[in-house]
Amino acid sequence: MSNFSPREIVSELDRYIIGQKDAKRAVAIALRNRWRRQQLDDELRDEVMPKNILMIGPTGVGKTEISRRLAKLAGAPFVKVEATKFTEVGYVGRDVEQIVRDLVEVGISLVREKRRAEVKAKAHQNAEERVLDALVGTTASPATRDSFRKKLRANELDDKEIEVDVAEAGSPGGAFEIPGMPGANIGVLNLSEMFGKALGGRTKKVKTTVKDSYALLVNDESDKLLDNEQIQREAVAAAENDGIVFLDEIDKIATREGGIGAGVSREGVQRDLLPLVEGTTVATKYGPVKTDHILFIASGAFHVAKPSDLLPELQGRLPIRVELRALTKEDFRRILTETEASLIRQYKALLETEGVALDFTEDAIDALAEVAVQLNANVENIGARRLQTVMERVLDDVSFNAPDRGGQGVTIDAEYVRRHVGDLAANTDLSRYIL
C-alpha cells in the first residue's frame, strides 16, 4: 500500500487527467484513509469502513480513468465492471459475486508478478543452466559447459535452435466447480493438482531459439521457486484490504417510479449489490473473501434517471458524491498538449517511426479543440473521446502516405484542420434530419 499524501495523489492524477478537482480530491482522500487505517491497532482497524464514492458526470470526462490511475498508483487489485452486465440471482447471466472472484484473480496476477521479480536473478541462473543442458547435454564436462557459457553470455549462440521442456499453460487446473454454486469447489475432485504435484506437473517440448527461450524458462523457473499457497493468501488479503471495484453505468440499473418489466430485474441487481457493498463473505476457489474493506466507486451519467432513483439502502452505502463537469474548449486544448501521453505526442511518435516529423501550430490546436466542442454539442457528447475521431480524420492522409514521405516534415495549421474536418461537420448537419 502506497503512502502518498492526498496532495501527491492529486498531482499524480493531474499528469493524466485534466480538471475534475473534486473527483480527484475524493479518491485521494479515500486512498489516504486506507493507509491511515493500516496504522491503527487491530481492534479499531476492523471497525473503520471505506467511504464508497458515487461519481456523476457525462461520458468521456475522466470517471473511469481516475479510478484506473488510482489503482495503478496504489498497486492495488482493480476491476471495472458494467452494472448492466449483471442479473438478479435466479435469472440467466452473471451474478454480482463474480465481481469479487474477478478481483481476487487480479490480485493473484499482481502478487505473482511481484514475487517473480524478487526471484528473477535466481530464476535467470537456473534458466541458463537449462539452456546449457539443451546445448551440450547434462553429461558434458565442466570445461565444455564453461566454454559454452561464455559464448552464451556473449550472445554468440542467440540464433541457435534448441528444444526445451516447459510446464504446460494451465496444467495446474483449478478444482471442479459445483453446478449452481459458483466459487465453491470439490477438493476431492481436484485431480489435476493432485497428480501435478505427484508427477512433477505436465510439461511439453518447445522448439525455440536460445534468445527466445529465456523468457519461457525464466517464467518457468520463477514459478518453481514460488509458493502458490502463500501467493493465494497474499492475493486474498490484498483484495480484501486494498481492492478497488469500479461499478460503471450504475444509473442504468436505477428504476424510475412507475417502471415495469425490466425494472424488476434491475432492482434485483441493486438488492444483490447491497450486501457486497456493505460487507459480506464471498466463496471463491481460493477461500472465503470478505468485502467489508473493498472500496467501491460507482459512476453514471444520470441523464434520464437520478441518483435518488437508486434504492435508498444503496444510496446510503455511497456516502461521498462528486459531480464531474462537461469538458470545455480550454479543457480539450489542455488534453491535447499537457497530459503525459497526449494524443499529439502519440501521433508525433508514431509518425517518427516512418521518418516523418509532425508539427502542430498553436492555431491548429485551437481548431482541433473547437471542432471537438462543436461535434459534442451538435451530435452526442462523448467527452474527450471525440478528439480521437477528429485527430484520425485530420491525419488520415498523412498516416496513409507516411511510408512514401520519409525524411519530410509536415506542419498542421488551422486551415489544414478545417479543410480535413469540413465534411465531418457537413455530415453532422445532415444527421439531424435522419430518423
Swiss-Prot record:
Positions of transmembrane segments: none
Compartments it resides in: Cytoplasm
Organism domain of life: Bacteria
CDD domains registered for this protein in UniProt: RecA-like_HslU
GO CC annotation: HslUV protease complex
Predominant localisation class: cytoplasm
Swiss-Prot/TrEMBL keywords: ATP-binding, Chaperone, Cytoplasm, Nucleotide-binding
Molecular function GO labels: ATP binding; ATP hydrolysis activity; peptidase activity; proteasome-activating activity
Disulfide bridges in this chain: none
GO biological process: protein unfolding; proteolysis involved in protein catabolic process
Binding residue positions for ATP: 18, 60-65, 248, 313, 385
InterPro entries, per the entry: AAA+_ATPase, ATP-dep_Clp_protease_ClpX, ATPase_AAA_core, Clp_ATPase_C, HslU, P-loop_NTPase
Matching Pfam families: AAA, AAA_2, ClpB_D2-small
Assembly: A double ring-shaped homohexamer of HslV is capped on each side by a ring-shaped HslU homohexamer. The assembly of the HslU/HslV complex is dependent on binding of ATP.
Protein family per UniProt: Belongs to the ClpX chaperone family. HslU subfamily.
NCBIfam families in the record: hslU (TIGR00390), PRK05201.1 (NF003544)
Primary role: ATPase subunit of a proteasome-like degradation complex; this subunit has chaperone activity. The binding of ATP and its subsequent hydrolysis by HslU are essential for unfolding of protein substrates subsequently hydrolyzed by HslV. HslU recognizes the N-terminal part of its protein substrates and unfolds these before they are guided to HslV for hydrolysis.
UniProt name for this protein: ATP-dependent protease ATPase subunit HslU
Origin organism lineage: Bacteria, Pseudomonadati, Pseudomonadota, Alphaproteobacteria, Hyphomicrobiales
